[in-house]
């Protein structure tokens, strides 16, 4: 930290030193939550645990904190707890769920296998959501430890599952739990198993939790066990809660504040965003301010190839379309921040024979979209539009697949293209917000709008698709 602590940071440091209360820091975009955590850590005299959202953040934090502060992610913490409970080294199999499903399908009568594989995405999505929010099948001996019901799982899925899905998901989740007890786990098990089933939690005088708004119910269950006798400091921004679709609790911060009787402190002075940028998001976050005047908001215009520039969009299809147009025009692009590249390629490959003509492929996309929408899919229109982008550029499905593979392998370009979800935690000098008017005003979409609009350090430009 190169600047003098702000009055807000001073107030937090005073609270840390002068009381034993649990604290929740509401840190707006670019408002120094990381530097504040480092400041807090530097004042501590006893051992502490810092829990970070992902591995890269944890690795960076580990270089900055005291030697007596342990830095973990929820996954690495859970892995060590489950390994200690298990008593020997665990086997981490990232394809565990697919292996279980394949064995299950292979044991079924041959006449049923095609149908079972058609349910693969629905079943595995349900199992992963179940493990994120804490569902245990009623048929399991430890079902009483569940913190979610099947209805909770269904409510959070992208589409309404067919009636057969619950029975298959329950059977395979029971098999997955049994494998975890035998020592074979995947990444979801690292949190699910120690959160709900068993394990001895380490004890620290102080536990600091970063990105609190992104905690899932099973993360919250881990925190409850971890902080039985510990002081807790949480940091997050409820306006940046955008991961409900993968199991995060949209009320994680308010729920924790009540459960742990936490005193709330603000961090509302942005070091990243100049005044024009912070004023622009007062419609959602009226308390955010900037340490510096300046910045600018623009509407319309073409992409300017300045250094440190990003194009960000709530939806993938407009992003893919513009990235492809930019690539064709001769400008190198970086689409590593597009969420669904591998999924789009997989969906294209499933449309039918690669010899399908453009017209036939477009018909297949329409049929796929109609089928998904009949199940109330929230993402089918965006996925279908992504596929249409590639099919419309070529004569055959084979050409569309090749086009998609070429685009999604572009990761070292002059302009970065990112979805709103993938842009979280990043910052750029110049940001183009593509098709902002298409963002809904319900659910977590306003939060995504805010996240995108607070990535720039200098300029924010709103642009529209040509289509």
Residue ranges and their predicted role:
Residues 26-37, 43, 53-56, 213-300, ...:
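Conserved helicase motor core of SF1/SF2 NTP-dependent helicases
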Residues 49, 68, 205-206, 232, ...:
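The start of beta-strands in P-loop NTPase/AAA+ ATPase cores
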Residues 174-176, 180-181, 186-197, 208, ...:
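Flexible, surface-exposed loop/gating regions in the mature catalytic domains
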Residues 349-467:
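Conserved helicase C-terminal RecA-like lobe
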Residues 2-14, 22-24, 36, 111-208, ...:
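Accessory N-terminal region flanking or inserted into the helicase ATPase core
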Residues 87-106, 258, 284-291, 349-373:
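A polyampholytic, Gly/Pro-enriched intrinsically disordered region
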Residues 55-130, 327-344:
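Conserved P-loop NTPase-based nucleic-acid remodeling module centered on helicase motor cores
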Residues 1-89, 282:
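P-loop NTPase Walker
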């Amino acid at each position: 930290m190169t600047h003098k602590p702000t009055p807000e940071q001073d107030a937090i440091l005073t609270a840390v030193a002068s009381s034993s209360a649990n604290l929740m820091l509401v840190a707006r975009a670019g408002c120094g939550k990381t530097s504040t955590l480092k400041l807090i850590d530097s004042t501590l005299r006893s051992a502490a645990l810092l829990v970070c959202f992902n591995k890269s953040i944890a690795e960076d934090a580990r270089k900055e904190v005291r030697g007596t502060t342990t830095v973990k992610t929820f996954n690495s913490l859970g892995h060590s707890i489950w390994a200690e409970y298990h008593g020997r080294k665990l086997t981490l199999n990232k394809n565990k769920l697919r292996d279980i499903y394949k064995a299950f399908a292979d044991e079924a009568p041959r006449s049923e296998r095609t149908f079972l594989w058609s349910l693969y995405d629905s079943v595995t999505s349900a199992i992963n959501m179940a493990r994120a929010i804490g569902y245990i099948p009623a048929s399991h001996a430890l079902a009483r430890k569940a913190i979610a019901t099947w209805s909770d799982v269904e409510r959070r899925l992208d589409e309404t599952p067919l009636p057969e899905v619950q029975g298959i998901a329950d059977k395979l989740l029971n098999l997955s739990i049994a494998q975890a007890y035998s020592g074979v786990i995947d990444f979801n098990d690292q949190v699910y198993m120690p959160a709900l089933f068993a394990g001895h939690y380490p004890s620290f005088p102080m536990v600091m939790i970063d990105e609190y708004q992104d905690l899932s119910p099973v993360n919250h269950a881990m925190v409850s066990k971890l902080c039985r006798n510990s002081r807790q400091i949480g940091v997050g921004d409820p306006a940046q809660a955008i991961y409900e679709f993968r199991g995060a609790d949209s009320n994680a911060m308010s729920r924790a504040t009540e459960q742990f009787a936490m005193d709330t402190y603000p961090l509302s002075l942005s070091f990243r965003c100049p005044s024009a940028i912070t004023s622009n998001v007062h419609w959602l976050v009226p308390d955010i301010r900037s340490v510096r005047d300046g910045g600018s908001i623009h509407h319309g215009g073409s992409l300017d190839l300045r250094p440190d520039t990003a194009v960000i969009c709530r939806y993938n299809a407009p992003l893919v379309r513009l990235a492809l147009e930019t690539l064709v025009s001769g400008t190198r692009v970086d689409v590593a921040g597009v969420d669904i590249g591998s999924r789009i390629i997989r969906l294209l490959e499933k449309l039918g024979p690669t010899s399908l003509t453009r017209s036939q492929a477009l018909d297949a996309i329409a049929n796929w979209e109609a089928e998904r929408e009949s199940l109330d899919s929230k993402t089918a229109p965006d996925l279908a539009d992504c596929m249409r982008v590639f099919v419309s550029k070529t004569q055959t499905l084979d050409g569309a697949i090749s086009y998609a593979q070429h685009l999604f392998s572009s990761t070292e370009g002059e302009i970065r293209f990112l979805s709103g979800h993938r842009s979280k935690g990043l910052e750029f000098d110049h940001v183009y917000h593509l098709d902002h008017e298409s963002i809904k005003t319900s659910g977590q979409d306003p939060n995504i709008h805010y996240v995108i609009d607070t990535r720039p350090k200098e300029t924010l430009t709103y642009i529209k698709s040509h289509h």
